A protein has these predicted regions:
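Conserved S/T- and glycine-rich ATP-binding loop of Class I adenylate-forming
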Residues: 47, 96, 169
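Accessory terminal helices/loops
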Residues: 9, 13, 17-31, 122, ...
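Short, basic and Ser/Thr-rich N-terminal targeting/leader segments
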Residues: 28, 40-43, 144, 160, ...
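Extreme N-terminal basic, low-complexity initiation segments
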Residues: 2-8
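Conserved beta-strand hairpin/beta-sheet module of binuclear metal-dependent hydrolase folds
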Residues: 27-89, 178-187
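Metallo-beta-lactamase
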Residues: 53, 60-66, 134, 143-146, ...
Length: 313
């Protein structure tokens, strides 16, 4: 599971694309398609290699009717239709972290299109914390083995001929990763649009100072790097947006633009977090997402349940 080889179908990719994937000096521009889930303000992505049929899916959403206890896959089906319609081969299903505000559709996407489910290798830390909170027994593995691949900081992998790099950017959670794919960085919940600022840092294992340093790591990328958000809430009623750039964020981000001191950010972020309630779907989301998007195992009658721990968060 913890192997690090880059899996590439060499027969399917032209030599020039392989050379580009191996050479960090070559600027690559993937095609990026966004899918907005209005119920959770989440943006999922299909990332395509223009030089082959390969693609990846990032942060797919499973629909949950919380009051009725019903799941469905309308949003995931839109992604499936896109991939099939463009005759793409899915190589990766990437989770930027264990999300606390929506349930992952990664297993559904994998069963429908193939691909490998991947997350950062600090997932074991998150599983240990929430395994205790949800009183999971020994059958719940706390080693990340529910996922097909665990990325360490700096791991390089390929999407067809695209070079992708996994960057550990903790602070929102201990396991958050940013994925730099060509000239595009998928930042998860670490960074928001300039008028949205930054993610909260008060979940178990979160830390505002660590978050600041992770954001500055992202903002040390080349100024033209495209940044793709996992969430947007349309501050002030503006239309939903999900793409900015390093240059825009360094100039305009209300929390972490150039000139903001680390200590000032920490003071602001911690004070703001004390005013925030928990996300509406945090309890079901964590139980599912720490299992790589699988529901908890069924009981003797084949029924599946989600727990509601009292005063645990």
């Amino acid at each position: 599971l913890r192997d690090r080889p880059v899996l590439i179908d060499a027969a399917a990719i032209e030599e020039r694309h392989m050379s580009a994937a191996a050479d960090p000096s070559v600027t690559q521009r993937p095609d990026v398609f966004a899918f907005f889930d209005a119920a959770t303000n989440t943006i999922s992505y299909v990332v395509e290699d223009p030089g082959s049929d390969a693609c990846a899916v990032i942060d797919p959403v499973m629909d949950l009717d919380y009051a009725a206890g019903r799941i469905s896959f309308a949003g995931a089906d839109a992604i499936v239709a896109h991939v099939r319609g463009r005759r793409r081969t899915l190589q990766w299903i990437v989770e930027t972290h264990v999300h606390a505000d929506h349930l992952s559709a990664a297993p559904y996407i994998k069963a429908t299109l193939g691909g490998r489910i991947a997350i950062g290798d600090r997932i074991a830390v998150v599983q240990e914390v929430f395994g205790r909170i949800f009183a999971e027994g020994p059958s719940f593995r706390r080693d990340g083995s529910q996922f097909d691949r665990l990325f360490a900081d700096g791991d390089i992998y390929a999407i067809g001929g695209l070079r992708a790099v996994a960057l550990h950017t903790p602070g929102h959670t201990p396991a958050c990763m940013t994925h730099l794919i060509g000239d595009a960085a998928f930042v998860g919940d670490t960074l928001f649009m300039p008028d949205g600022g930054s993610a909260r840092a008060d979940f178990p294992g979160g830390d505002a100072r660590t978050l600041f340093r992770s954001m500055r790591r992202i903002l040390d990328l080349p100024p033209s790097t495209r940044l793709f958000m996992c969430h947007d809430y349309g501050p002030g009623g503006r239309p939903i947006r999900w793409e900015s750039s390093v240059a825009e964020e360094r100039r305009d981000n209300i929390h972490v633009r150039d000139g903001v001191a680390e200590n000032d950010f920490v003071t602001m972020r911690e004070a703001r977090d004390r005013t925030l309630g928990m996300p509406r779907l945090i309890l079901p989301s964590l139980q599912v997402n720490m299992r790589a998007g699988e529901l908890p195992p069924p009981d003797a009658d084949g029924r599946r349940f989600l727990k509601l721990p009292i005063d645990a968060l």
